[in-house]
Amino acid sequence: MAYYPVQMRGMNLKKLLLIFLLTFSCNTMAEWVEYSTRANGDVYFFDKARVQKNGNLVNVWNRIRYKTSVMAASSYQSLIKIDCSEYSETTLQSTFYTDKNWTTPAMATNTREKPKVFIKANSASERLADNLCQ
């Protein structure tokens, strides 16, 4: 058994605790709920714990796990704003991941707001909006 001074043992424990907290704190606070599985096998989730409603506007974190890789991406996460009064959505930020568990970004997060689009009938977005705009 290796001998480490008391100060060094405490420092290693602090580093280990910090790594543990950083690794698991974000996912433990999230409550990902599956809301759609498309015919192509893609599975959609939203984070129920971080839904923010302000009048007719709803901000929600959204995830997609692709059945087959899309341009080297196996999963996707975005923050979207849904306007319940006009049934539209705006992507506020988005990240593609090379793995199916949203841990390895394929590129930097895109923080540019995308143009508003109207929600299409029979889409995953419609199912999400129907759920959140009640």
Regions found by a protein language model. Give the residues of each.
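Short, solvent-exposed linear motifs at loop/edge-of-secondary-structure regions
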Residues: M1-Y4, F20, A30
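Positively charged n-region of N-terminal signal peptides that target proteins for export
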Residues: A2-L16
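Sec-dependent N-terminal signal peptides
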Residues: L16-F24
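N-terminal secretory-pathway/extracellular module detecting exported/lumenal segments
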Residues: T28-S78, D83-Q134
